[in-house]
Amino acid sequence: VKHRYLGNSGFKVSELTYGNWLTHARQVDNKEAIKTVKAALESGITSFDTADAYANLEAEPILGQALKNERRSGIEIFSKVFWPVADKKPNDHGLSRKHIMESIDGSLSRLGTDYLDLYQAHRYDHETPLEETMQAFADIVRAGKALYIGVSEWTAEQINAGAKLAKELKFQLISNQPQYSMLWRVIEGEVIPASKKNGMTQIVWSPLAQGVLTGKYLPGTAAPEDSRASNTEAAAGGIAKYMSDEALTAIQKLKPLAESL
């Protein structure tokens, strides 16, 4: 697995990143989850992406357990903040200073690490002044709790505003994590140009449209047993919109091209 720089920084990540959104503590038991992390490491993947909201606080500890014996300087750990978790108290969501500061301490504890390589705003918070959010991120970087800051699913306008404030606060936004695949290309019009303008690169989620682009789902045929599409909870995560016979028929036309590469 090759490595490349993330954004306009000296920080390198593996081209393929291991994410545990719909797997750890949900679709895969803990032993199998740890095995998959070990397999990723053996294949050369060094970057691992999670979030406090994944499996409602339960995904981070599993990833932390799987990585606990790894040399910390040889891996890159990403997490995120925004969504409510646990008991969902009034301040337990969004990008307020209170929630960001408490959330990163929780993530560090669950992951068993002293710092995150990348801490990401999981969404944009329309209820908190952006200045408050960016100041909190700046303080986290200065405290050494996170080395770099990124965002997820921000619009071009939000990226421009956030990057400007970050620069004023003497740090930088280096990444955006949007949904992006051959079946979902909405970021190409404005988000990618805004990201490039601000020295940010994409860490895309669902690049295979949650497995649909693997070609294993066939039109007029039931989803394979134990696949994501056969799991009711997973289907609610977004795969259902790609499972029409029309879409699956079109995807099958890509197989000869894929096999020729």
Question: What do the PLM-derived regions correspond to, one by one?
Answer:
Residues 1-75, 114, 142:
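N-terminal binding-site loop/beta-alpha segment at the start of enzyme catalytic domains
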Residues 6, 18, 33, 40, ...:
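Conserved, mostly hydrophobic/aromatic
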Residues 14-15, 72-75, 79, 114-118, ...:
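Short acidic capping loops at alpha-helix termini that bridge into adjacent secondary structure
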Residues 20, 50-52, 79-81, 123, ...:
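A cross-domain feature marking catalytic cores of carbohydrate-active enzymes
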Residues 22, 84-90, 213:
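A short acidic, helix-capping loop that chelates divalent metal ions and anchors anionic groups
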Residues 27-40, 94-111, 130-135, 159-163:
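Short, acidic/polar
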Residues 87-120, 179, 183:
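Active-site gating/metal-coordination segments in enzymes
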Residues 128-261:
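Beta/alpha (TIM)-barrel catalytic core signal, keyed to glycine-rich beta->alpha loops juxtaposed to Asp/Glu
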